[in-house]
């Protein structure tokens, strides 16, 4: 990754030989973005998208080497504020577009060295792994980075030695759908096999079943992309365990988490799959220069002002980009907003719905508590000294099928024996009008027993909640799970690796909706959970008993400190005085507070369920 300077001559970028630790991720700015944000009221430019007019770094706009404007804020329904710093052209003269041919020519030497080095990497990985895997494939998303990754790969490898795979989430921008169609035809013309994978559910169905995805409850990528792709490739190219190299357009500068990726890794997404990121160290400057130099397809969404192309409604999307999305695709965005409000259990009367959507309240849910669902958990554990008693809504043989992924199950004359890691437990089941009961011999608090309870809860989650999203099928590294016609089958070849049981809460659907009604019934549960408590607030209050963070945060802080026993009616208690003397730098202070917090509804629920 190279540093760059602004080039007044071309209005573009000029790479230099200095290495840059962190890119500012520059991107070209076309007239459509200027129109959407309202710059057309102040600047004169032709409505021509054959070339950009300027560049942006985050919210700052650069024209021929000068910062001429910036934007602030913006929400789903409110345009960002424009801050005009200086006139791009004197006396209102028309803006001059970036001279792309000259910019490309001036960057040729440095860019070509980077490109050739990347092509060699791809070829060397191919040589090293071609006898170890069933297939090489480029994971294509329709974004600029995957366009570049694909072009690099097709230059490095024979066209019959890799596939292109598009995971259709049914939530893409319309511009992505258009680009994928063009790219598919181009691949066909060049002898490259282009494949598409999709979930057996539409996005409308999945959002209504799982509830809208959130930052901490992101079922969407697995259900709509990763699992369908792995299952499709396994069915098509593998006889048993799939071994493959997935070539991506992932770049380290896209996010903090991606900056920690290794260029080559094994099993990070799915077991049996190597992930190779050939352009991991490329910056967006190099990406755009390569696209322009090769005349590659560019998703029109970038011309509207997006720095990344993903789904129409994403919990990780910024407020500014949500505004642009709604300006570009109003009907689609409003459709997803309706799904969000229809599934929320919050009071969204009056202006509450608009505020909820504008502030991204839907993005912060941690469980099913905030969803409009009306059922208790379908299984519960009541532990006695003699038995682990699992009550279930409906007793079916499905739990015995899933138990085969955990250990051996034997039935003889009504007696059930369960084996886990060479330890056998007696089991019995019964059923009445209220549901079913599975009683398992309690063998104490050994490591084996703790693991047994954890994994058996996953077995019950699958048996009670499975909606056949097929994530478990994809998670099995040996392809020993199959689902068809509403039935789950576990092969006798299952090696009990437990990968399928380690899915969040045992089942993505259960993980998304769990705790819905049970948590709604707990008074005081929402005193501080939806906003969260900053430890610095507590530290500051203990240092200065008059400290308040302001607005709703103050209520949240006092709610937490009331539960912790520090204050009562916003006045310091004797316990609070003790904590003040000890100070929050003493870990014992927090331990004592947690002793009090353990009796509150939120912490009670966490202790018993998590």
List each language-model region with its residue ranges:
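Donor-sugar nucleotide-binding helix/loop cap in glycosyltransferases
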Residues: 514-610
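Short linker/helix segments within small regulatory modules
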Residues: 303-306, 482-493, 497
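Extended serine/threonine-enriched, polar tracts that run as long, contiguous segments within proteins
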Residues: 284, 293-300
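ATP/NTP-dependent adenylation/nucleotidyl-transfer catalytic domains that generate, transfer
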Residues: 1-94, 98, 299, 304-458
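A broadly conserved sequence feature marking short terminus-proximal activation segments
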Residues: 254, 259, 263-282, 418-474
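Iron-sulfur cluster-binding cysteine motifs and their immediate structural context
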Residues: 471-487, 499-513
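Short microdomains enriched in Cys/His and/or Lys/Arg
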Residues: 331-347, 490-505, 514-519
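ATP-dependent adenylation/nucleotidyltransferase module used to activate substrates
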Residues: 2-286, 290
């Amino acid at each position: 990754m190279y540093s760059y300077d602004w080039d007044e001559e071309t209005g573009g970028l000029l790479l230099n030989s200095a290495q840059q630790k962190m890119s500012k991720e520059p991107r070209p700015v076309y007239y459509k973005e200027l129109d959407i944000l309202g710059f057309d009221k102040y600047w004169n430019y032709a409505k021509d998208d054959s070339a950009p007019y300027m560049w942006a770094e985050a919210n700052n706009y650069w024209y021929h080497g000068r910062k001429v404007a910036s934007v602030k804020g913006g929400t789903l329904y409110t345009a960002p504020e424009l801050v005009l710093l200086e006139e791009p052209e004197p006396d209102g003269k028309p803006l001059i577009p970036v001279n792309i041919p000259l910019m490309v020519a001036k960057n040729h030497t440095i860019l070509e060295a980077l490109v050739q080095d990347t092509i060699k990497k791809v070829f060397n990985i191919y040589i090293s792994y071609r006898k170890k895997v069933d297939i090489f494939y480029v994971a294509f998303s329709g974004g600029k980075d995957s366009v570049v990754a694909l072009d690099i790969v097709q230059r490095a490898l024979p066209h019959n030695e890799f596939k292109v795979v598009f995971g259709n989430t049914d939530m893409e921008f319309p511009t992505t759908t258009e680009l994928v169609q063009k790219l598919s035809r181009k691949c066909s013309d060049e002898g490259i096999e282009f494949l598409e994978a999709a979930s057996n559910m539409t996005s409308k169905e999945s959002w209504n079943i799982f509830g809208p995805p959130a930052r901490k409850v992101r079922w969407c990528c697995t259900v709509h992309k990763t699992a369908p792709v792995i299952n499709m490739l396994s069915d098509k190219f593998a006889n048993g365990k799939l071994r493959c190299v997935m070539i991506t357009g992932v770049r380290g500068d896209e996010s903090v988490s991606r900056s920690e990726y290794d260029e080559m890794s094994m099993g990070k997404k799915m077991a049996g799959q190597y992930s190779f990121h050939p352009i991991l160290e490329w910056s967006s400057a190099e990406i755009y220069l390569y696209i322009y130099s090769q005349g590659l397809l560019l998703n029109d969404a970038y011309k509207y002002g997006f720095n990344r192309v993903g789904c129409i409604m994403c919990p990780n999307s910024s407020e500014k980009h949500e505004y642009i999305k709604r300006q570009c695709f109003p009907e689609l965005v409003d459709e997803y907003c309706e799904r969000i409000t229809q599934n929320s259990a919050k009071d969204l009367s009056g202006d509450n719905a608009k505020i909820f959507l504008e502030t991204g309240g839907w993005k912060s849910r941690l469980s099913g508590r905030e969803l409009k669902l009306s059922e208790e958990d379908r299984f519960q554990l009541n532990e006695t000294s003699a038995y682990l008693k699992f009550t279930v809504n409906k007793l079916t043989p499905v739990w015995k099928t899933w138990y085969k992924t955990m250990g051996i199950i034997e039935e003889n004359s009504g007696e059930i024996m369960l084996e886990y890691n060479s330890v056998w437990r007696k089991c019995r089941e019964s059923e009445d009008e209220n549901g079913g009961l599975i009683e398992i011999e309690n063998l104490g608090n050994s490591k084996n027993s703790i693991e047994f309870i954890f994994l058996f809860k996953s077995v019950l989650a699958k048996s009670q909640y499975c909606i056949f999203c097929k994530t478990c099928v994809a998670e099995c590294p040996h392809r020993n799970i199959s689902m068809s016609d509403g039935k789950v089958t576990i092969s006798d070849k299952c090696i009990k690796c437990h990968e399928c049981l380690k899915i969040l809460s045992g089942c993505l659907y259960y993980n998304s909706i769990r705790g819905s009604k049970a948590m709604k019934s707990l008074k005081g549960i929402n005193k501080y959970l939806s906003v969260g408590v900053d430890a610095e607030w507590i530290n500051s209050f203990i240092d200065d008993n008059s400290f308040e963070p302001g607005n709703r945060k103050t209520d949240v802080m006092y709610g937490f400190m009331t539960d912790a026993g520090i204050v009562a009616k916003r006045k310091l208690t004797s316990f609070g005085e003790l904590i003040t003397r000890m100070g929050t730098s003493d870990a014992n202070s927090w331990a004592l507070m947690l002793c009090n917090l353990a009796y509150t509804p939120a912490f009670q629920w966490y202790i018993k369920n998590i």
